[in-house]
């Protein structure tokens, strides 16, 4: 699964990791199911997000607001996020963009952090 993350500027890694543990427990998804973290380009150098990715051992992939906004589908909108980033939702859109699949767990928010999970398409070959 791909983890989509949005966060306020200056959010510590600990806040992201704490919310992630709660989010995964609520969704009954193992941490081992995560393959990457995705967000918006504005967060490419966000220290707390980079540190959280380092602790998790996962790569961070970011996308421009235009690429996230172009994704079709129902996403949980936020006028505030739209005013700051230029796209109405970062976590869900980034997760879907990074996975190429469908939203598995919708936006979960607390203390300036938003998380979402999307499933990568899987087609076994025999």
Positions of the model-derived regions?
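Structural motif
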Residues: 1-3, 35-36, 61, 101-104, ...
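C-terminal edge-of-domain segments
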Residues: 92-126
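Alpha-helical scaffold segments in soluble metabolic enzymes
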Residues: 19, 51, 92-96
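Conserved mixed alpha/beta catalytic, RNA-binding, or beta-rich assembly cores of soluble enzyme
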Residues: 1-43, 118
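Long, charge-dense
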Residues: 40, 49-89
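Fold-independent oxyanion-binding glycine-rich loops
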Residues: 5-8, 40-42, 64-65, 87, ...
């Amino acid at each position: 699964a791909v983890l989509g993350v949005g966060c306020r500027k200056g959010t510590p890694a600990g806040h992201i990791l704490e919310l992630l543990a709660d989010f995964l427990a609520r969704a009954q998804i193992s941490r081992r199911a995560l393959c990457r973290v995705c967000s918006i380009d504005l967060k490419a150098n966000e220290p707390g997000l980079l540190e959280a990715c380092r602790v998790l051992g996962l790569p961070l992939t970011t996308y421009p607001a235009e690429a996230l906004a172009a994704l079709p589908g129902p996403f949980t909108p936020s006028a505030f996020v739209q005013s700051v980033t230029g796209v109405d939702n970062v976590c869900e859109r980034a997760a879907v963009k990074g996975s190429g699949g469908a939203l598995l767990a919708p936006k979960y928010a607390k203390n300036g952090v938003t998380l979402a999970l999307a499933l990568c398409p899987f087609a076994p070959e025999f």
